[in-house]
């Protein structure tokens, strides 16, 4: 209460005692220190706290000192409330070079990570790449050396090349699995039992060769019809070349028959070649029984059709598969290799093809020699045996007695039709040394 009364008495003092000379020392101090810093303000605060002590010591100068210190305290409050760039005189007096240095430090301190990551990282996070999940899968499979990848291999490729998916591992892996199973461009290939590891492989479907990744949308797109036709033409030429080699390899695995002569002749129509002549294929398939009956081998070398096993039945496919091939081998064994087979029309059977067919009989009859006879008027089988011994492609000839006990044991495991064929040949043609 005493303080309030003292303050009221101070306000009631007449202002006639106020003089300009009392303000002169403060003006001089302001000229010496035109812009005080924060440190001076902090040093003047204890003087503001000592006002009650000076109030009792110097009663005549109380109003002047109190008003000046109140103004200074108001200035301090205003400067502290304002941001440092505007109200702080120390900050406003910084030269332009210092401001540039401060800005550079801020960029290097916080935003400098974006320069290290190639501009993909903004505000501490990577941007999502503008590619669909199908495009990411296709990129991963196409860059692999074997053009196939497992599911983990696809994950590793995406996380290695796109850091966004390395930081955000939730959700996108399920999307990758769904796109692999739903999109027809991707085919699942089972792992081979010799291949170590887990999981199936994923490959691109051959029909997806014309699929590319759009540059603007990042989605899969197909090429136009013209470019697609060119790709189909190239793909067809490639498949035909590989298909021929595959059929050649497959044919050598199942049946060592020469591809130049087949029992089932292709039913191709007669076409003109480039020089205007007709092709070697007839318009109607010619049965091989007629081919064999046109040669002049004699009655001993002609096949009988009364024994139930004729060449017509061979061609028509009425004989089982194993009997068919074995009979074909026996058929070739009984035909002289060097014999030309004349045929009517434009169809002619090359003797080389007959030689190739006869050479295949070693597959079933390894002990049977392959004769090489050039004369059609040969009458004795001894001359044939002598000529076959001089043939370069025939193996070493064995005596006829060594062949006789081997044939019954071989024919016992054959079907009824072929065994009848061998017994008929043994009974009917006694001069044929190839069978008995």
From Swiss-Prot:
Keyword DNA-binding among record annotations:
yes
Residues annotated to bind DNA: 128-222
Q: What is the source species?
A: Xenopus laevis (African clawed frog)
Q: Which Pfam families match?
A: Forkhead (PF00250)
- List the GO biological process terms: cell differentiation; negative regulation of cell population proliferation; negative regulation of DNA-templated transcription; negative regulation of neurogenesis; nervous system development; positive regulation of cell population proliferation; positive regulation of DNA-templated transcription; positive regulation of neurogenesis
Expression by tissue, per the entry, reads: At late gastrula and early neurula stages, expressed in a narrow stripe at the anterior end of the neural plate. At later stages, this stripe of expression thickens and expression also appears in the lateral margin of the neural plate. The anterior line differentiates to show expression in the forebrain, anterior (nasal) retina and olfactory placode, whereas the lateral cells form neural crest cells that migrate in the first branchial arch. In tailbud stages and tadpoles, expressed primarily in the neuroepithelial cells of the telencephalon.
Which top-rank group of organisms is this from? Eukaryota
Write the protein's name: Forkhead box protein G1
What PANTHER family is this protein classified in?
A: FORKHEAD BOX PROTEIN G1
Q: Which GO terms describe its cellular component?
A: nucleus
Q: Compositional bias of type Low complexity: which residue ranges?
A: 44-56, 375-397
Keywords, comma-separated and alphabetical: Activator, Developmental protein, Differentiation, DNA-binding, Neurogenesis, Nucleus, Repressor, Transcription, Transcription regulation
Using the UniProt annotation, give all residue ranges assigned to the region (Disordered): 1-63, 79-129, 375-402
Q: Which GO terms describe its molecular function?
A: DNA binding; DNA-binding transcription factor activity; sequence-specific double-stranded DNA binding
Its main localization is nucleus
Job of this protein: A neural-specific transcription factor that can act as both a transcriptional activator and a transcriptional repressor. Both represses and activates neuronal differentiation in a dose-dependent manner, independently regulating cell fate choice and cell proliferation. Converts ectoderm to a neural fate. Suppresses the transcription of the cell cycle inhibitor p27xic1 and promotes the proliferation of neuroectodermal cells at a high concentration. Promotes the transcription of p27xic1 and inhibits ectodermal proliferation at low concentrations.
State where the protein is found. Answer: Nucleus
Q: Where is the composition biased (Basic and acidic residues)?
A: 1-12, 96-128
């Amino acid at each position: 209460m005493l303080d309030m009364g003292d303050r009221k008495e101070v306000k009631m003092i007449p202002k006639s005692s106020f003089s300009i000379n009392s303000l002169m020392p403060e003006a001089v101090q302001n000229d010496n220190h035109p812009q005080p810093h924060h440190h001076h303000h902090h040093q003047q605060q204890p003087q503001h706290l000592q006002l009650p002590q000076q109030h009792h010591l110097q009663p005549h100068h109380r109003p002047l000192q109190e008003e000046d210190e109140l103004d200074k305290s108001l200035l301090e409050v205003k400067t502290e409330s304002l941001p440092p760039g505007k109200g702080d005189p120390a900050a406003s007096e910084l030269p332009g070079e210092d401001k540039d240095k401060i800005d550079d430090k801020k960029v290097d301190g916080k935003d400098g990570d974006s320069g290290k990551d190639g501009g993909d990282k903004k505000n501490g996070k990577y941007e999502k790449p503008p590619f669909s999940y199908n495009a990411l899968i296709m990129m991963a499979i196409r860059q692999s050396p074997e053009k196939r990848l497992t599911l983990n291999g696809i994950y590793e490729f995406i996380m290695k090349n796109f850091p966004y998916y390395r930081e955000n591992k939730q959700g996108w892996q399920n999307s990758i699995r769904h796109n692999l199973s739903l999109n027809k461009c991707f085919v699942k290939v089972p792992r081979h039992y010799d291949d170590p590891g887990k999981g199936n492989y994923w490959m691109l479907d051959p029909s997806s060769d014309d699929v590319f990744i759009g540059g603007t949308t990042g989605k899969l797109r197909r090429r136009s019809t013209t470019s697609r036709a060119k790709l189909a033409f190239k793909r067809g030429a490639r498949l035909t070349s590989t298909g021929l080699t595959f059929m050649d390899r497959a044919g050598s695995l199942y049946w060592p028959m020469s591809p130049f002569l087949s029992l089932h002749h292709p039913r191709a129509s007669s076409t003109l070649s480039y020089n205007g002549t007709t092709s070697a294929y007839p318009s109607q398939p010619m049965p091989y029984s007629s081919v064999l009956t046109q040669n002049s081998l004699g009655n001993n070398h002609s096949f009988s059709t009364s024994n139930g096993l004729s060449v017509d039945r061979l061609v028509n496919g009425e004989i089982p598969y194993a009997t068919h091939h074995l009979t074909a081998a026996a058929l070739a064994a009984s035909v002289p290799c060097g014999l030309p087979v004349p045929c009517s029309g434009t169809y002619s059977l090359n003797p080389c093809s007959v030689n190739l067919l006869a050479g295949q009989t070693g597959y079933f009859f390894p002990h049977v020699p392959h004769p090489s006879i050039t004369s059609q008027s040969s009458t004795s089988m001894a001359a044939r045996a002598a000529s076959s011994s001089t043939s370069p492609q025939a193996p070493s000839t064995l005596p006829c007695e060594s062949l006789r006990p081997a044939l019954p044991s071989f024919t016992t495991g054959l079907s009824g039709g072929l065994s009848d064929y061998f017994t008929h040949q043994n009974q009917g043609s006694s001069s044929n040394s190839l069978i008995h």
